[in-house]
Each structure stands twice: as structure tokens, then as C-alpha cells.
């Protein structure tokens, strides 16, 4: 009943493959020595990376963003080492890491301060008990300027919270609609 530490996260990765790929410590530099926005294991969480897959919202077709009838023309898909999000706009992406959440744990995921201090807000819904998949990441540029997000670098921190008791019905048992998601996943009903 509380937030799990780096030791617990490390054990769950070794025993249950909770995070793949897994970085044992905070990575702040590439092999060539250039700096990156940090990712990997931290004291009480795991800093996930954003992949090279992005869906950037666009108004080219004047579509309405409707969660019950999502129009795929609402965004432009791209694969790149970085993503430029237009002013006051939004992009979807996915994590590099694949997660397997234990039955008695729920997560909260918060954007890294490096991006938050630039007006880039990351929203990720909780990873529910026994959810498994790549995380879809919602990235908002709240500034009046274009904003750059770097692929394969840190974007948000996942905090693992122990429940007081296991849930009676897990996300997997409910056949959750985002179970085993692979790519950037748009709204489903």
C-alpha cells in the first residue's frame, strides 16, 4: 500500500518482465556522448521513452474530434527522430517500452519536468491491474510556438502504486479495449 521503489521495479522486471526494454538506471547520454532527456529507472518510478511513431492532429479536412466516431483524417502520421507539434496543438505517440502491470498495482504517469517547463504537457491514463501493452501517450503543446519532442528519449515517469488488496476483476478479465495495444492507438468504444 504505497508507491514502489526502484528495488521493487527491478525485481518485477526480472521476475515478470514488467517493462521491456528496461534500463537499469537513468540514462542521460547516448553512446556518442550527446545528451538526451533522461529515461530509465528512477528512485520511485520509471521514466519511459517516446517511440518514433507520432500522430499529429491537423485541421486540413476540418474534422471534428469525436471520441465516439474518430475520423482518421484528423491527424497526420509520421515516423521520425523528433516531432514538431504545432502551436496549441496535440499529438499522440507510443512508448518504446512494453508494460505488464501486476494484478495488485495501478500506475500514474506524469510528464517530465523538462517538457513541462517548455509548455509541453503529457497525459497518460493509468495502467490498470493486469493491463499489458505499449502506452499511448497524449502530448499537448500549450504554447503559441511550435514545440519539439525527441523520439527515443524520456517523456514521462510511471509511478507504480500498490493496492491495499487485489481487485476482484482486472483489466484483462474485463477484456479492456486497449489490452495488448501495439502502436499509437486512437479512441475506441
From Swiss-Prot:
Catalytic activity: dCTP + H2O + H(+) = dUTP + NH4(+)
The enzyme's E.C. designation: 3.5.4.13
Pathway note: Pyrimidine metabolism; dUMP biosynthesis; dUMP from dCTP (dUTP route): step 1/2
Binding site for dCTP: 112-117, 136-138, 157, 171, 181
Disulfide bonds: none
Pfam families linked to this entry: DCD
Catalytic residues identified in the record: 138
Keywords (A to Z) from UniProt: Hydrolase, Nucleotide metabolism, Nucleotide-binding
UniProt-listed GO biological process terms: dUMP biosynthetic process; dUTP biosynthetic process; nucleobase-containing small molecule interconversion
GO molecular function: dCTP deaminase activity; nucleotide binding
Family per record: Belongs to the dCTP deaminase family.
Function field: Catalyzes the deamination of dCTP to dUTP.
Protein name from the UniProt record: dCTP deaminase
Keyword Nucleotide-binding: yes
InterPro entries (alphabetical): dCTP_deaminase (IPR011962), dUTPase-like_sf (IPR036157), dUTPase_trimeric (IPR033704)
Keyword S-adenosyl-L-methionine recorded: no
Subunit: Homotrimer.
Principal EC category: hydrolase
Source superkingdom: Bacteria
Amino acid at each position: 500500500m504505497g508507491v514502489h521503489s526502484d528495488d521493487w521495479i527491478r525485481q518485477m522486471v526480472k521476475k515478470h518482465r514488467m517493462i521491456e526494454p528496461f534500463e537499469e538506471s537513468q540514462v542521460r547520454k547516448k553512446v556518442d556522448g550527446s545528451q538526451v532527456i533522461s529515461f530509465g529507472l528512477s528512485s520511485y518510478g520509471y521514466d519511459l521513452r517516446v517511440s518514433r511513431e507520432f500522430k499529429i492532429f491537423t485541421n486540413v479536412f476540418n474534422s471534428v474530434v469525436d471520441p465516439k466516431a474518430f475520423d482518421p483524417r484528423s491527424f497526420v502520421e509520421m515516423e521520425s527522430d523528433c516531432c514538431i507539434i504545432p502551436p496549441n496543438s496535440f499529438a499522440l505517440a507510443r512508448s518504446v517500452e512494453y508494460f505488464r502491470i501486476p494484478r495488485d498495482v495501478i500506475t500514474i504517469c506524469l510528464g517530465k519536468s523538462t517538457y513541462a517547463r517548455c509548455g509541453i504537457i503529457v497525459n497518460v491514463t493509468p495502467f490498470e491491474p493486469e493491463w499489458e501493452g505499449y502506452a499511448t501517450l497524449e502530448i499537448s503543446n500549450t504554447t503559441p510556438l511550435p514545440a519539439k519532442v525527441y523520439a527515443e528519449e524520456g517523456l514521462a515517469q510511471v509511478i507504480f502504486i500498490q493496492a491495499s488488496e487485489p481487485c476482484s476483476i482486472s483489466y484483462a478479465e474485463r477484456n479492456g479495449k486497449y489490452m495488448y495495444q501495439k502502436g499509437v492507438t486512437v479512441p475506441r468504444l
